[in-house]
UniProtKB/Swiss-Prot annotation:
Effect of S78L: In strain: Isolate SIM7
Protein topology in the membrane: Multi-pass membrane protein
Organism encoding this protein: Drosophila simulans
Residues covered by region (G5 motif): 30-33
Topological domains, Cytoplasmic: 1-322, 362-454
Transmembrane segments: 323-335, 339-361
Designated gene of the protein: fzo
Protein name: Transmembrane GTPase fzo
Regions annotated as coiled coil: 112-162, 411-434
């Protein structure tokens, strides 16, 4: 009882002893009396309730002691409930969560981090290889661009050299033979028929010269260009295979003012002999002769004329006069210089030769004369346009080579752009993988922190 302190302490000791025996000896909850002593409480629940409700204004010392014991009981009881709950319910869940975290770390997060790291390294290596390939491709493009320029210059020089050679050769050899072998009805007595003959001859020469130039110049150039395109790796199209130089020859335009001279001319006539003599003998306007100086150069000195200029003018007027005065004077000089029989024999020979040439001056001979005059004039005029024609060939070649260059540049830039696109895609993949790797590492760190807290 609370009114008898001695009895209260005695009863308390008895209860303490009985409870210790119960907990240690009978129940075996604790192994020592000290542990059991700490779990024995002497409290009054009603008294503690009154104190908390404020019914006891001035509690005694024993009341305060019992209230403190009750507070210790509440604290130990709540801790016991918490420990019991952890052991019976929350403990297995915490262990299961910790096990799941460890499994996630070992089977998912760590391998995933390693996989992402390996992919990042592989993509970085691949990007480095692509960058090296881009640099190598740019250097290769520069080298190929220089080689292409050199090849273009070589083809241009070849076109100039071969074109000039082919044209001169065709003008020198093909035109005379082609004109001579041309066969078409020839009627010199009809001017309209001569014009038709000339137009047919021009068309024949146009086709023949164009075909020869195509075979000798265009086809070799086309083969070299195709070989160059194959070396550059360009796609050979039908347009590239069909390319050829355009050589539009129009002989009719060159010979539009051609007027053939089909009159009979005696080869031993005075005019013919005069032209031959005029071409062989140096006149007062003859070419200059050269004299070598001490310094190695040559000095031009005029050749002295065999006959004075005044004498040539007199002879020319006599020979070329339309009257018979020249013939009479020359005949008188011949009779005076030679005997009559010799003059008659020479006259007979000259007359016989004249009759032979006049009889041989047939339509075929006139056609040969026409072809000879036509061939000489056409050769002369074509030679003057050789350089202009070669320049036209060069311009066509440069235009085609410019198209080849543009095609090569487009293909090279397409390859370079493809490499740059692949590099950019790898860079994006690397960045996204790095972000993923960082997130995985954060999750791993949070999991480790949660596992340590559990």
């Amino acid at each position: 009882s609370s009114m008898e302190p001695e009895m209260e302490q005695k009863v308390k000791d008895q209860h303490m002893e009985r409870c210790v025996n119960l907990l240690v000896d009978e129940l075996g909850v604790y192994s020592t009396a000290q542990e059991a002593w700490e779990r024995i409480y002497h409290v009054s629940a009603l008294e503690a309730l009154h104190i908390r409700n404020g019914h006891i204004k001035n509690p005694s010392a024993q009341t305060k002691e019992r209230y403190q014991e009750f507070l210790r009981f509440e604290n130990d009881f709540s801790n016991c409930l918490a420990v019991s709950a952890l052991k019976t319910k929350f403990g297995p869940h915490l262990l299961s969560a910790q096990k799941i975290l460890n499994q996630l770390k070992s089977t998912l997060i760590s391998p995933f981090i390693e996989k992402v790291s390996r992919l990042i390294d592989e993509n970085k290596e691949r990007r480095a290889n692509l960058n090296a390939e881009i640099e190598e491709w740019e250097l290769e493009m520069q080298d190929e661009r220089e080689d292409l320029q050199y090849c273009f210059e070589e083809l241009t020089e070849m076109t100039q050299r071969l074109g000039r050679c082919v044209l001169n050769d065709q003008i020198k050899t093909l035109i005379p033979s082609a004109v001579l072998s041309f066969s078409h009805p020839f009627h010199p007595e009809f001017p309209a028929q001569i014009g038709q003959y000339q137009r047919s001859l021009c068309a024949h020469l146009d086709n023949l010269l164009e075909d020869r130039v195509l075979q000798c110049l265009s086809i070799p150039l086309q083969r070299k260009i195709l070989d160059m395109e194959k070396e550059l790796g360009l796609q050979i199209t039908e347009k590239s295979c069909d390319w050829q130089l355009i050589y539009g020859l129009d002989c009719q335009s060159y010979m539009s003012d051609f007027q053939p001279d089909l009159r009979f001319r005696f080869s031993l006539g005075f005019t013919a002999l005069w032209h031959r003599l005029e071409g062989n003998l140096p006149l007062h306007s003859s070419p200059f002769r050269t004299q070598k100086l001490r310094n190695g150069h040559k000095k031009c000195l005029p050749l002295p004329p065999l006959v004075h200029g005044n004498h040539w003018q007199m002879l020319e007027s006599l020979v070329k006069s339309k009257g018979s005065l020249g013939t009479v004077l020359l005949g008188a000089m011949a009779i005076r210089s030679f005997n009559w029989p010799i003059v008659m024999i020479l006259g007979g020979l000259v007359g016989s030769f004249y009759m032979y040439e006049y009889a041989a001056w047939t339509t075929a001979a006139q056609e040969r004369s026409f072809k000879s005059q036509y061939s000489r004039l056409l050769q002369q005029r074509l030679r003057t346009d050789v350089q202009q024609t070669v320049s036209g060939f060069e311009l066509q070649l440069r235009q085609h080579l410019a198209k080849v260059r543009n095609c090569w540049e487009a293909q090279s830039n397409e390859t370079l752009n493809d490499l740059n696109v692949r590099t950019a895609e790898l860079t994006k993949q690397i960045q996204s993988m790095e972000v993923l790797q960082l997130s995985l590492k954060k999750f791993r760190d949070k999991g480790q922190l949660l596992a340590s807290r559990l």
